[in-house]
Amino acid sequence: VKDMVKQSGLPIEIVEGTKERHDAFKSGDVAIAASGTVALELAIVDVPHIIAYKVPKLTEWLARHFIHIQFVNLSNILLGKEVVPELLQQDCTVEKIMYYVEQFMKHKPVYNQQMDGFEKVRKLLGMGQQTPSDNAAEAIIKAIKNYRK
């Protein structure tokens, strides 16, 4: 990746390490993420974000038939409700992405609601106790078990 960036001649800075990555996250107003651990990191450092993701049709079909969870975003799974908008498959459009970006940038209550959710996520993960990945794994397993009841 470093060679490709260097060859491009573009003013791109590659950051390494957790602190540099989190500082880079916090330098923006809103993030668009593809879910996974990066979205959980964004929540931990209070960066408003949305999830935008498309998968191949076969993957979508398999997921719908074999994986029964209400949300894909880790913060949403942990909280049992949507605090991070999930724009998946046909909902992943430029118009919908821009709508949510504008909501976070122009409407303080929308922004505050997500920040409140992130505070709850950090508490659920027991930040400062076990490692965040261990806490996340335990909380997600618990959330999935509760959802299936």
Set out the residue ranges of the language-model regions.
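Nucleotide-activated sugar donor-binding and catalytic core shared by glycosyltransferases
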Residues: 1-149
